[in-house]
Each structure stands twice: as C-alpha cells, then as structure tokens.
Amino acid sequence: LSKPSLFISNHRDIVLDPALVNYALFDIGAKTVEIAVGDNLLTKEWISDLMRINKSFIVKRSEKTKRAMLTASKNLSAYIHHALTDKQQPIWIAQKEGRAKDGIDKTNSALISMLLLNKPKPMAIKDYLDELNIVPVSIAYQYDPCDQDKAKELATIETEGKYEKSEHEDINSITKGLMGYKGKIH
C-alpha cells in the first residue's frame, strides 16, 4: 500500500474483523489500523482498556439531539481525514452501525455522507474520496458463535417491531464472538 487507506468493512465481530485486517497489514510490513468503535461498547472497563490497547477511537452513537449528532459526525469526519492524511495512519470502520445480523452486507449511505462532512466546498467529491484511499473489505466466518442471538433479535423485531438490548448484551456478544468457534475464515 503506497498510502494509508480507509478500510470500510462488513461487520461480524468488532474485535476479530479489524484484527484480521491488522494481521494482513502487519504481515506485509505496513502500519496497522486505528479502529472506529461505537461508544455503546464501552460499558465495562476491560472493554475500554482493550479498545485503547488496539488503537481505537470512539464513534459517538448515543448523542441525544440532531445537533449533537451532527457535531459528532463532523468531528469524526475531520479526525478520519486527519489520521489518513496528516498522521499517515490507516483506519478501519464498519460499513454500517452494528454487526450485520441478517447477512446483508451493504454500506450505509450515511457513512459516506459522514466522511464527506469534512470535504472542502470547492473540492470535487471524487477527489476527496480519492484522498481517503477507500479499500472495501469483506470477511466471512464459516460459523458465527452469536448466530442464535442474532436470529432471536431479528425474530423479536419481526414479531414485536423492536428489540431492547440488555445492559451488557454487546459485551457478552463480543466475548462470545471472540472465544467461540468460527471455523474457516475468509
């Protein structure tokens, strides 16, 4: 890789997905990525510690007002651009909020909109996106240790219209995903 890249990845496992990208980069002698992590995951101290050790930065997903969300999105956009262009630091970010539970891997257009918030007005969109050096990433696991939990969540949404996570459900999913059997990975 001639310059730092923004790796936009499908999302199955917040720990292992970027770790696999880092392994591939390390294997070729390239810098490893900084990892975008949602603030919803930082409910336990050991998770916060794990994220800090792994060069993570926070994506504020829990802002309460539209103005606060816009400010957080602008700051995130500016940071990603700064990391790539000034720090020469590659970045990993999921293509959409949360893990894919339905197997549909489609980049959320809001992600691209967020990335463009930092674009100077006179600059062409294509030129700005070229600066970000976006690299799509797709990772597949033969087995998903969280598949029953994901199916239960989708079924609840289908029958009740919504799903309420328990307090540390995301953390339990991280642990199960990290420790569970995944079979072949590609």
Stretch-by-stretch model annotation:
Residues L1-I185:
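Soluble catalytic domains of membrane acyltransferases
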